[in-house]
C-alpha cells in the first residue's frame, strides 16, 4: 500500500488520533503532491483511490484530464481508479467528462448520497459486469459478518438509470 499525502500535518494527525501505523513492508507513506507523484512514478497499481480536497473543497490538479490520464497510465492491465467527488460542485459534470475521456468511456459515477459525496470509477482491462442481486447478497453478508451496511448503496443503484436490467456494467 502506498499512500501519498501533500500535508505532513495530516499524516501526523492520522498517527496521533486515528492510529495510523508506522510504515513497514506492507505500507509506505510519501509526503508529496499526488498529481506530481502519479506523473513521475514508474510503479503500477491495481487500485488508485483519490480523495483530495483542500479546506475550501477544491481538488486542484487532482481533478484534471492530465491527472486522470496519468492515473490510467499507472494502472495495471485490470486496474481501477476510484475518485471521491462532490456532486454539488458546479464542476461535477465536467469531472465525470474528464474521467470518461481519460478512460475512453470506461467511467461511471455512482448516485451521490445526501451529503453530496459521489464516488466515480474508471477501469482498464476487461468489462466489469455484476448483477445487482449478487451485490445485494454480498451487502447482506457484509452487514451480517462485519456490521458494514452497504444495502442503502445497493438500493440507490437499483433505482439508477445506469443499472436498468439489474446489471452494473463498467
Give each language-model segment a name.
Residues 118-170:
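SAM/dcSAM-binding transferase cores
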Residues 58, 86-89, 103, 163-169:
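Alpha-helical subdomain
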Residues 1-77:
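The AdoMet/dcAdoMet-binding core of the Class I SAM-like
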Amino acid at each position: 500500500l502506498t499512500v501519498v499525502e501533500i500535508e505532513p500535518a495530516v499524516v501526523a494527525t492520522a498517527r496521533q488520533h486515528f492510529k495510523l501505523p508506522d510504515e513497514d513492508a506492507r505500507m509506505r507513506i510519501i509526503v508529496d503532491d499526488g498529481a506530481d507523484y502519479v506523473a513521475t512514478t514508474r510503479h503500477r497499481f491495481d487500485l488508485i483511490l483519490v480523495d483530495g480536497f483542500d479546506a475550501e473543497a477544491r481538488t486542484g490538479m487532482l481533478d484534471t484530464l492530465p491527472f486522470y490520464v496519468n492515473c490510467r497510465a499507472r494502472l495495471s492491465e485490470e486496474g481501477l481508479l476510484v475518485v471521491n467527488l462532490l456532486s454539488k460542485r458546479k464542476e461535477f459534470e465536467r469531472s465525470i467528462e474528464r474521467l470518461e475521456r481519460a478512460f475512453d468511456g470506461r467511467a461511471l459515477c455512482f448516485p451521490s448520497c445526501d451529503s453530496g459525496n459521489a464516488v466515480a470509477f474508471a477501469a482498464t482491462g476487461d468489462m466489469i459486469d455484476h448483477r445487482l442481486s449478487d451485490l445485494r447478497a454480498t451487502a447482506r453478508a457484509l452487514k451480517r459478518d462485519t456490521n458494514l451496511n452497504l444495502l442503502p448503496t445497493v438500493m440507490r443503484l437499483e433505482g439508477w438509470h445506469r443499472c436498468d436490467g439489474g446489471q452494473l456494467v463498467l
